[in-house]
């Protein structure tokens, strides 16, 4: 008797289910979740929910076969969904991913998905499927701020029941936590607790769209590392190389560090900053070479590279540990051989590469921009992606020897996790003749260069010689040297005048004698140089030779007056000459000297 009664109860529950518009009607096959085993993995900063669902076709008055079924997301978590995948239990995962398409349900809010079954379900038949969902940023730190020595606790809120548009006959839920330290958790159905596990259920005869808040507050010191923004640039060359560069903005999205940071305590105490991030590992393709890792300052030498058989493991250690709320930025780049990723048949090319690659375990990428730079001349570009991505208008990129630019595919996606590490395929056409464009440009450039050099060396660009002009230039050069030497000689006189004045004040005869000796030596040298230049002017046939000769004679008179002034000063100091007489004589000497200097200036102006 119990089985018919339970069956009648479930049929009554099905009467309240609203089918999907367009995909189901009042004659939609009656489905039921016969058994659901749900696992909620909260051991990292992600919430991974896996449900093993035994889906049954009740049959009854309906004889139609079920070709698809509906999935619903919990209203509290639907906005943070990063990944949804459905597979048939017990079959090869790679070949058995079911087609999932988002849809709407009339009269119901929230997000719903239609899952296409691999084989139509007959009345009375069953099928076991595995529903995998991954949610990001649903574990909230509580308290939101902690000191360096405190541990991190988080709160998660979900649903005790499997949220579904179908009634569920029996269901259980196992919650896997990051530690055994649990502050509190909801007690619906007297759950059992063992170490870091919470087991709920079984819950029986659960109506469709049932909700009951599940909440747990527990210790979670796993790295709450989030890539807030990432730009991945892939540059393809048909000459055998693919260059990859990733610009990454990182942030610790756990509990914000409260108070100061002590590096001394951090190094001394193993449990200091237990929720901080010292380093993480990035897995690069096995063929990666010429790997570099740098930030705004420059190359970061604390990174380590380990080459394995199937990958290249890179340990990235930022310049400082990351605590809650702290950010950093870095760039990783490497080269790949194109023969492993680029395929062609004639002018048809296909590039098969990952849309996003591994950055760290349990990665979360809030915003990703991928730029694929194709060779110049690539046309008819199409993209095949395993999941939905957003395209921006194509751009152009210019580099060495480019003429009309390389096409750049720009694609965006938000909220990515490890499940998005899948290949995309870029199809395009490329005329192989264009591969000769750059070598021909180089050859043409060298040809033009050599031709220009040949023409240049065969042309005569020399200026016709003018003997008269050359003579004038030589005379001008000699005259310039004469002017310089005359000015130096006049400077000697001024310097000697200062020596005489110092002598009159100090009455030190050695100062005067030293000044006379210096004057005689330097004056003789300058006069000899001027005489040599005078002879060169005479050789050039210039009439300036006579003027220089006249200037030499005037200078001899100036020198004589300068020395006479010194003699008068000696007589004054020795008391052989009265001061009034000395002043009168000095006035006469200065007048004659000034007259001679004026004549010399006129000659210099004439030169």
From Swiss-Prot:
- Pathways per UniProt: Protein modification; protein glycosylation
Task: Tell me one GO biological process term.
Answer: protein N-linked glycosylation via asparagine
Spell out which residues lie on the membrane's Cytoplasmic side: 456-607
- Chief localisation class: endoplasmic reticulum
Q: Which residues form the signal peptide?
A: 1-23
Membrane topology, as annotated:
Single-pass type I membrane protein
Q: Where is this cross-link: Glycyl lysine isopeptide (Lys-Gly) (interchain with G-Cter in SUMO2)?
A: 538
Q: Which GO terms describe its cellular component?
A: oligosaccharyltransferase complex
What residue ranges lie in the Lumenal compartment?
Answer: 24-434
Compartments annotated for it: namely:
Endoplasmic reticulum membrane
Q: Keywords, A to Z?
A: Acetylation, Endoplasmic reticulum, Glycoprotein, Isopeptide bond, Membrane, Signal, Transmembrane, Transmembrane helix, Ubl conjugation
Looking at the UniProt entry, the stretches that span the membrane are 435-455
Q: Which InterPro entries match?
A: Ribophorin_I
Tell me how the protein is altered or processed after translation.
Ubiquitinated by the ECS(ASB11) complex.
Indicate which residues are glycosylated according to the record.
299
- For the modification N6-acetyllysine, the affected residues are 187, 538
Q: Belongs to which family?
A: Belongs to the OST1 family.
Q: What does this protein do?
A: Subunit of the oligosaccharyl transferase (OST) complex that catalyzes the initial transfer of a defined glycan (Glc(3)Man(9)GlcNAc(2) in eukaryotes) from the lipid carrier dolichol-pyrophosphate to an asparagine residue within an Asn-X-Ser/Thr consensus motif in nascent polypeptide chains, the first step in protein N-glycosylation. N-glycosylation occurs cotranslationally and the complex associates with the Sec61 complex at the channel-forming translocon complex that mediates protein translocation across the endoplasmic reticulum (ER). All subunits are required for a maximal enzyme activity.
Query: How would you summarize the oligomeric state and partners of this protein?
Result: Component of the oligosaccharyltransferase (OST) complex. OST exists in two different complex forms which contain common core subunits RPN1, RPN2, OST48, OST4, DAD1 and TMEM258, either STT3A or STT3B as catalytic subunits, and form-specific accessory subunits. STT3A complex assembly occurs through the formation of 3 subcomplexes. Subcomplex 1 contains RPN1 and TMEM258, subcomplex 2 contains the STT3A-specific subunits STT3A, DC2/OSTC, and KCP2 as well as the core subunit OST4, and subcomplex 3 contains RPN2, DAD1, and OST48.
According to UniProt, the name of this protein is Dolichyl-diphosphooligosaccharide--protein glycosyltransferase subunit 1
